[in-house]
């Protein structure tokens, strides 16, 4: 990956949805028209002050924004080195960053006259957030979820059902996030007239990567303003976990042109990248096409997508958002692997030092933040996106420790 100078990172994507050589739209002919309709509707909505006002109102009064920045002082003292700050997306309604995006897309669905929304989910947080906004707006909701993920995220499955959603188990492939996304795509092709597909990450064909980014960019805008207001400066480094990468690009985007801020994504290294049991698409993947866009993917020598592994259902995906692929190639961001064990250690450490249970996805970012902090002096700041809360993962962690709850 060779770095090349980029004058303005906010100028991407281009009119065709490309982030450099990544992104674009590689879909069946039956989806070309619906995607063009969606792009046109989104571009009109984002220029409409009434739509923006409705979105901002829901973020404030329904989601509970802004989310605070919290100085994890006891954690920082324990780790040594730089101060670790947490952007508390875990405090949002539904417990994660996902609702920033689902609120925006659901409002767009209603504006387009769609009566039914579908979604894919891995950890269940996007499914819960989609079911939540569907209930809020009176829309039918169907969520596709891999059977493997249903087993490890039973609480979120029940939450979706309580909210009135239908949860469809997906048993094909590895029965995880990529397979759920495949089935949701098939549903959309069949029912495009009345159905809106709320993709939960910054992947998929254009306009999804930019649309999901834009709805999550509130995270970084708030964080940047909060840093300047509370500390009079920007952080020295920022980090977030990266599966598809929606929470990460949400934080990163506001800082992309602040060249003095180091940007590091934490990918799921699973049992270790050397073992092959991981989901580190940038660290160990190659450029290819997955789910309608060109990006880094995990595939074999024949180009077939390989099965992934992560203790975190939300990071268990064989691709990454095209903007992250672009940022990696340009040298603006680094993407490093965090193993299951490192994430679990970070989970327990935050619980013990700060009284906060982070999601397993967020625990990867926390582990990376701790590594960055150790390398830096005490007067520097590492800002970590705590993308979600860990209530959903308690059963998974207990099971790994031999406990039955």
Curated annotation (Swiss-Prot):
Keywords tagged on the record: Amino-acid biosynthesis, Aromatic amino acid biosynthesis, Lyase, Pyridoxal phosphate, Tryptophan biosynthesis
Involved pathway(s): Amino-acid biosynthesis; L-tryptophan biosynthesis; L-tryptophan from chorismate: step 5/5
Uppermost EC category: lyase
Residues modified as N6-(pyridoxal phosphate)lysine: 98
Purpose: The beta subunit is responsible for the synthesis of L-tryptophan from indole and L-serine.
Subunit structure: Tetramer of two alpha and two beta chains.
PANTHER family: TRYPTOPHAN SYNTHASE, TRYPTOPHAN SYNTHASE-RELATED
Protein name stated in the entry: Tryptophan synthase beta chain
Organism of origin: Stenotrophomonas maltophilia (strain R551-3)
């Amino acid at each position: 990956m060779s770095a090349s100078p980029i004058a303005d990172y906010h100028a991407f994507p281009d009119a065709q949805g490309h982030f450099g050589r990544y992104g674009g739209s590689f879909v069946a002919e039956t989806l070309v028209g619906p995607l063009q309709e969606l792009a046109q509707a989104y571009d009109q909505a984002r220029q409409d002050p009434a739509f923006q006002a409705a979105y901002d109102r829901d973020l404030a009064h329904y989601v509970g924004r802004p989310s605070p920045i919290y100085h994890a002082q006891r954690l920082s003292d324990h780790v040594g080195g730089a101060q670790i700050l947490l952007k508390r997306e875990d405090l949002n309604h539904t417990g994660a960053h996902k609702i920033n995006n689902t609120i925006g897309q659901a409002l767009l669905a209603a504006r387009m006259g769609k009566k039914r929304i579908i979604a894919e989910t891995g950890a269940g947080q996007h499914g819960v957030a989609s079911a939540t906004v569907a209930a809020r707006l009176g829309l039918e909701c169907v969520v596709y979820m891999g059977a493997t993920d249903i087993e490890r995220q039973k609480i979120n499955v029940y939450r979706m059902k309580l909210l009135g959603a239908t949860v469809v188990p997906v048993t094909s492939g590895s029965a995880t996030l990529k397979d759920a996304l495949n089935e949701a795509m098939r549903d959309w092709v069949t029912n495009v007239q009345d159905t809106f597909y709320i993709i939960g990450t910054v992947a998929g064909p254009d306009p999804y990567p930019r649309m999901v980014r834009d709805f999550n960019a509130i995270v970084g805008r708030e964080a940047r303003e909060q840093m300047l207001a509370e500390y009079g400066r920007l952080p020295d480094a920022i980090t977030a976990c990266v599966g598809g990468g929606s929470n990460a690009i949400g934080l990163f985007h506001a800082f992309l042109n602040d060249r003095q801020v180091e940007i590091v994504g934490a990918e799921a290294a699973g049992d270790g990248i050397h073992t092959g049991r991981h989901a580190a698409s940038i660290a160990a993947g190659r450029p290819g096409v997955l789910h309608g866009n060109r990006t880094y993917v995990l595939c074999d020598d024949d180009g077939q997508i390989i099965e992934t592994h992560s203790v975190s259902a939300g990071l268990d995906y064989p691709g990454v958002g095209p903007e992250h692929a672009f940022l990696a190639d340009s040298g603006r961001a680094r993407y490093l692997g965090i193993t299951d064990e490192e994430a679990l250690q970070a989970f327990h450490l935050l619980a013990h030092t700060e009284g906060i249970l982070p999601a397993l996805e967020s625990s990867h970012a926390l582990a990376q933040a701790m590594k960055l902090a150790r390398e830096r002096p005490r007067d520097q700041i590492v800002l970590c996106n705590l993308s979600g809360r860990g209530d959903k993962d308690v059963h998974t962690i207990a099971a790994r420790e031999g406990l039955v709850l």
